[in-house]
From Swiss-Prot:
Residues 401-476 form the B5 domain. Mg(2+) binds at D454, D460, E463, E464. Pfam families: B3_4 (PF03483), B5 (PF03484), FDX-ACB (PF03147), tRNA_bind (PF01588), tRNA_synthFbeta (PF17759). PANTHER family: PHENYLALANINE--TRNA LIGASE BETA SUBUNIT, PHENYLALANYL-TRNA SYNTHETASE BETA CHAIN AND LEUCINE-RICH REPEAT-CONTAINING PROTEIN 47. This is Phenylalanine--tRNA ligase beta subunit. Tetramer of two alpha and two beta subunits. It comes from the Bacteria. The gene is pheT. GO terms for biological process: phenylalanyl-tRNA aminoacylation.
Length: 804
């Protein structure tokens, strides 16, 4: 919301300075976002260059004799390439502050020649980036006058950021009212008397709506005959330009002016272009309207229009139509002031993608009691600027506003804010804000004014009292100290999340944050798409479902990087997925994707050989590393071949703890999945469920036991077993490990071989077994006994035999 200082003072009688006004606005909750005070240029003078001679000691400098209008030329040294005799520019004198250079001018010598000022460029004055030369004004610019006055920069522009509840401050009068209540002046009475019209308005208004649920709660219409519509006066144009509006013509500018002045949107129709009466009704499916922004909008039955016999002439409360717009040929004008349902305005504006000053105000809620005065203000301006003869104002469907009454115990201020405010002060503040007040010394019975539709209860009155009384008057208090924090601060799941995140980052993966919303097609490709997980009001068509997996978002992110030249990339995310619409169906998951050659050991080409494409074992290693970091008992995890349908059936696995607890899945992606997501390249991924990891058993002692290291040398033994081709290597590893759990501390597969020499349907799996004796050195007899145990265990559990 922008306004100029002089515009504010039309409503506020005050002697406060600009700085005081700006500070007070922020204090009372109307936060000032910017102040454009070009009046700071008032010290700079328009001056004419009389002569320009070359500097005696510098080829690129000139010595100028400058006329400032007082008959006493000033000598200035200047290096601008466009400096010349006859140029009219802007002179800064000693003592003037130059904002673009952040310096204060003084008399100085430049290469031995005194300079008594500076001819300025636009960038040096900080109102544009132009710096190719000094400012070159029109030849008839008045020499000796203030540059700020000449440019119309005497009026500072203030911009405030409004919260959605403060609809009353979408007009400058509302801002002035708050400042007056805060003690910074007196609110002027600027509302005019009703304009006396002659004769009825020939165009009637028909409200075609459900009387029990109206979308238009009032409509005022008046015709002014015989107007002369030309440019608006200079003062109005300057104010509109200052707040970023483009002057069009007097009639249109008046509606814009009243919109910002009073927070009361209006519209004007060229009466000659309106056929028959005006009907406020729902739009018909397929109807179109060419709006004032020169765009054609397709309407539907959920929208509302003001129509005549030709069809829609205005999108109600949002934007008028081009067909009935006012131009320089307008003679008879219809002035409209109406009340619209804020929800209807917001919905229609959102569907059509239209943002206007009228929509901004109506969807927040305008003052219902300003409908008629707003029309009177506009009528008075039309008569002053365009002439004409008004008819009687025709008001349809309006019912007087019923004020809300709130019983407000003043003790609520102390209870909710800790601020001590007396009954008398609270009473006075609410009265100054326009509330009707009466009370018994303890409780104030407050009648909410029509312009404060956001005040609904006691807490809102506390806010009003507090912001006017002054938040800065709250005494600062130190936070109470309760000593050291006892016990654990983070939950188990938070600790697991932190550890998993650090582990995956340490493995060369980059953390990503993807949307929790994905398209229906993506959701179905990853086991989702349930009706209860569809968004009621999605922000986009491709963000309609809550994600059942982290992998769709990560795959899309990896592909976007690949499209931009980053083919080898590893991404991970630790976040939530959704299996249902209840809290227990939201799971905490760590997921990751590797693409191209983005392996742990490095990606791309290097002197010792090119990195191979990522595959199932890279995803498996990531999944196990994340689970181990999160505290899962990885030594007890079982790995089953195969995974969910979005993974390759022969190159994927499932990590389980017992027959029921699934800790995660990993593998390469199914080609159909990649095609559905429009993703290509070598890709693998994983997901581990951090909330499925069992809680560790409680330990009797908080300290870790002493580390016990064996004093005896460890040793390794290799074994090769011939097994059926369907036997998994993991089962052989488990069988070997179970032969002697105390002595065998590690088993690793180092070779898998298939060939005719083994027989049809057979394969050889070779493992390295790490042995660690604890109490003595192993003898040959001990190793022989252990070998027999290993062979017997493998034969029993897998049917394998020792390869000869």
């Amino acid at each position: 919301m922008k306004f100029t200082l002089s515009w504010l003072k039309d409503h506020l009688e005050t002697d406060a300075t600009l700085d005081e006004i700006v500070e007070k606005l922020t204090d009372i909750g109307l936060e000032v976002e910017s102040v454009d005070d070009r009046a700071a240029f008032r010290a700079f003078t328009i001056a004419r260059v009389l002569t320009a001679t070359r500097h005696p000691d510098a080829d690129k400098l000139q010595v100028l004799s400058v006329d400032t209008g007082d008959g006493k030329p000033v000598q200035v040294v200047c290096g601008a390439p466009n400096a010349r005799a006859g140029l009219v520019g802007v002179l800064g004198r000693p003592g003037d502050y130059v904002p673009g250079l952040d310096v204060t001018l003084s008399v100085g010598k430049i290469r031995g020649v005194e300079s008594f000022g500076m001819m300025c460029s636009e960038r040096e004055l900080d109102f544009s980036d132009e710096h190719n030369g000094i400012i070159d004004l029109a030849e008839n610019a008045p020499v000796g006058t203030s540059f700020a006055a000449y440019m119309g920069f005497n009026d500072p522009i203030i911009e405030i950021g409004l919260t959605p509840n403060r609809a009353d401050c979408t007009g400058i009068r509302g801002i002035a009212r708050d400042l007056a209540a805060a003690g910074l002046g007196t609110l002027k009475n600027t509302l005019p008397d009703a304009v006396k019209g002659e004769g009825e308005t020939p165009v009637k208004v028909i409200l075609d709506q459900d009387a029990g649920n109206p979308f238009c709660t009032g409509f005022a219409l008046r015709m002014v005959k015989g107007v002369k519509n030309g440019p608006s006066p200079k003062w109005m144009q300057q104010r509109l330009k200052a707040i970023g509006l483009r002057p069009i013509n007097a009639l249109v500018d008046i509606t814009n002016y009243v919109t910002f002045d009073q927070g009361r949107p209006l519209h004007v129709f060229d009466a000659a272009k309106v056929k028959g009466n005006l009907t406020v009704r729902t739009a018909r499916d397929g109807e179109t309207i060419l709006a004032l922004d020169q765009r054609e909008y397709k309407l539907n039955a959920g929208m509302y229009v003001i129509a005549d016999e030709n069809g829609p002439e205005s999108i109600a409360g949002i934007m008028g139509g081009e067909h009935s717009g006012c131009d320089e040929n307008t003679v008879d004008v219809l002035i409209e002031s109406a009340l619209w349902d804020p929800r209807m305005i917001a919905r229609t504006g959102r569907e059509l993608g239209i943002v206007t000053d009228a929509r901004y105000r109506f969807e927040r809620g305008v003052d219902p009691e300003m409908m008629v005065p707003g029309a009177e203000i506009a009528t008075k301006l039309v008569l002053e600027l365009c002439g004409g003869q008004p008819t009687v104002l025709d008001v349809v469907g309006y019912k007087p506003h019923t004020a809300r009454v709130i019983d407000f115990p003043v003790t609520e201020v102390k209870r909710l804010t800790g601020l001590d405010v007396s009954y008398e002060d609270a009473f006075d503040i609410l009265k100054r804000l326009g509330f009707g007040v009466e009370g018994d010394g303890k409780t104030i019975r407050a009648t909410v004014p029509s312009w404060r539709g956001d005040v609904e209860g006691k807490a809102d009155l506390v806010e009003e009292v507090m912001r006017i009384h002054g938040i800065n008057r709250i005494d600062p208090q130190p936070l109470p100290s309760h000593g050291a924090v006892n016990g654990r601060i983070l939950t188990t799941l938070q600790i697991r999340t932190r550890h998993a995140r650090r582990m995956l980052a340490s493995r060369g993966m980059m953390e990503a944050v993807t949307y929790s919303f994905i398209s229906e097609a993506q959701a179905k490709a990853f086991g989702g798409g349930k009706p209860e997980l569809k968004l009621a009001n999605p922000i986009a068509a491709d963000m309609s479902d809550m994600r059942p997996s982290l992998l769709p978002g990560l795959l899309a992110a990896a592909q976007r990087n690949a499209d931009r030249g980053f083919d080898d990339i590893a991404l991970f995310e630790v976040s939530g997925i959704y299996e249902g619409d209840t809290p227990d169906k939201q799971r905490r998951v760590a997921g990751g994707v590797r693409r191209g050659t983005a392996k742990v050991e490095g990606a791309g080409r290097f002197w010792a050989g090119n990195a191979a494409p990522v595959g199932v074992f890279d995803a498996k290693a990531d999944a196990l590393a994340a689970l181990e970091a999160a505290g899962a008992p990885v030594d007890r995890i079982q790995i089953e071949a195969g995974g969910p349908e979005w993974l390759h059936p022969g190159r994927s696995g499932t990590l389980k703890l017992g027959p029921k607890v699934v800790l995660g899945t990993f593998g390469e992606f199914h080609p159909d999945t990649l095609e559905a997501l429009d993703v290509s390249g070598a890709l693998c991924g994983f997901e581990v469920y951090l909330d499925a990891i069992p809680e560790p058993k409680a330990k009797s002692a908080r300290t870790k036991p002493a580390l016990s290291l064996s004093l005896f040398q460890s040793l390794k033994r290799d074994y090769a077993f011939v097994v059926d081709a369907a036997v998994e290597a993991g089962n052989v590893v488990k069988a070997v490990s179970s032969a002697d759990k105390k002595l065998i501390v590690g088993v690793q597969v180092f070779d898998i071989f298939t060939g005719a020499s083994l027989g049809e349907g057979k394969k050889s799996i070779a493992v390295e077994v790490l042995l660690q004796p604890q109490d003595r050195t192993l003898t040959d007899e001990d190793l022989e006994v252990l070998s027999k145990q290993i062979v017997a265990s493998v034969a029993k559990q897998t049917g394998g035999v020792l390869r000869g």
